[in-house]
Regions:
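Active-site metal-binding loops of divalent metal-dependent hydrolases
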Residues: 45-46, 298
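Conserved phosphate-binding/catalytic loop of the ribokinase/pfkB sugar-kinase fold
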Residues: 99, 125-131, 138-173
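Conserved post-catalytic alpha-helical subdomain immediately downstream of the catalytic base
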Residues: 259-260, 285-348
Length: 350
């Protein structure tokens, strides 16, 4: 796939113009080994994911909808909590800052985070009275999602909660190698908090990665890596995407005022635009797609780990793409291990 401004096969700084040079298994192993010694701070909207799985045997006589006979149900971590789960699964230390409600779901979510690993700090998770913990319930049958039911309050938290969140970030920034911000538009990342997190990280010299929601793109000025998905960016801009065009990608990056724009393109992979450079395309390496739930969370987590481990943004994007290719082959919101990523790379995938 050619990219505007560079002919296929032209080499610049060790990269084939338009396509990221494959990252060798040795370098991937090195980054994953370094990940065991890094600390990532995760800030954002915490969610609890519930799953109900069963078989469809008939249509309901009450309405033209399938009747699911439940065979099993389980819960998992979603949103920023899933980012934290992915960080810990790769062996890094993690601190989490966010909010849950003073309810059973909030306690379940906190217990699930606390039970993952000794190297996770959840003292920065605030329990907010009167706020319902966000719960997404997915009903599954025959490897397909039939319906999703959301329980949430998407209103913004007040200034007092915002002050407490920023104080939690200040107390945890020392020693962090990266800050991952996961914005699901559920009230945590109001402008006050978003700007404050970026300012605290910048003062500490810590790179930031933001997975934004459409209506909040403009509040992340100065972020190291902004990582929207294709639909969010297209909706925000109101125009078709042109990830192969250097002029278009650079104009979008400059307009969003981020140092690096990493656009996730689903089955087409990713496109990375760094200031003053050609856009670099990272093809998808997924061999099978079972469930895309939480894949963006995995990418955010692995990007943060890659940067914290000393990788470049381009190297971290390749590492994250390996992880995404693996996680979409798993059921529900899932994580990947260092061994899985390394095996994926050694198997000959780009």
């Amino acid at each position: 796939m050619a990219v505007g401004g560079a002919g296929a096969g032209a080499v610049r700084d060790g990269r084939v113009a338009g396509h990221l040079k494959p990252l060798g298994a040795n370098r991937i192993a090195e980054l994953l080994e370094r990940a065991q010694d890094v600390h990532v701070l995760v800030v954002g909207d915490l969610m609890l994911d519930r799953y109900i799985s069963g078989r469809v045997g008939r249509i309901s006589p009450e309405a033209p909808v399938p009747v699911v006979r439940v065979e099993k149900d389980w819960s998992g971590l979603g949103g920023a909590a899933n980012v934290a789960a992915n960080v810990v699964a790769l062996g890094a230390r993690c601190s989490v800052v966010g909010c849950v409600g003073d309810d059973a779901a909030g306690r379940e979510l906190s217990d699930a985070l606390r039970g993952m690993d000794m190297d996770i700090d959840i003292e920065g998770v605030l329990q907010v009275e009167g706020y319902p913990t966000t719960v997404k319930t997915r009903v599954m049958a025959l490897r397909q999602q039939i319906v999703r039911v959301d329980r949430e309050d998407a209103g913004d938290f007040d200034g007092e909660v915002g002050d407490q969140l920023l104080e939690a970030v200040r107390r945890r920034i020392a020693g962090c190698g990266a800050v991952a911000v996961e914005d699901y538009n559920k009230g945590v990342l109001v402008p006050q908090v978003a700007a404050g997190v970026l300012e605290i990280a910048e003062e500490a010299g810590v790179p930031t990665i933001v997975d934004p929601k459409r209506r909040r793109f403009s509040q992340y000025e100065g972020v190291t890596v902004l990582k929207p998905n294709a639909k969010e960016l297209e909706d925000a801009l109101g125009e078709p995407l042109q990830p192969q065009s250097r002029a278009w990608m650079e104009a979008v990056r400059a307009g969003l005022k981020c140092h690096h724009l990493l656009l996730t393109l689903g089955e087409e992979g990713m496109a990375l635009q760094s200031e003053g450079e050609e856009p670099l395309l990272v093809p998808t390496w997924a061999r099978s797609v079972y469930d895309v739930s939480g894949a963006g969370d995995t990418v955010t987590a692995v990007l943060a780990i890659g940067l914290a481990a000393g990788g470049t943004v381009a190297e971290s994007a390749v590492l994250a793409n390996h992880a995404a290719a693996l996680v979409v082959g798993k059921a529900g919101v899932a994580t990947v291990t260092p061994e899985e990523i390394l095996h994926h790379a050694e198997r000959g995938d780009p």
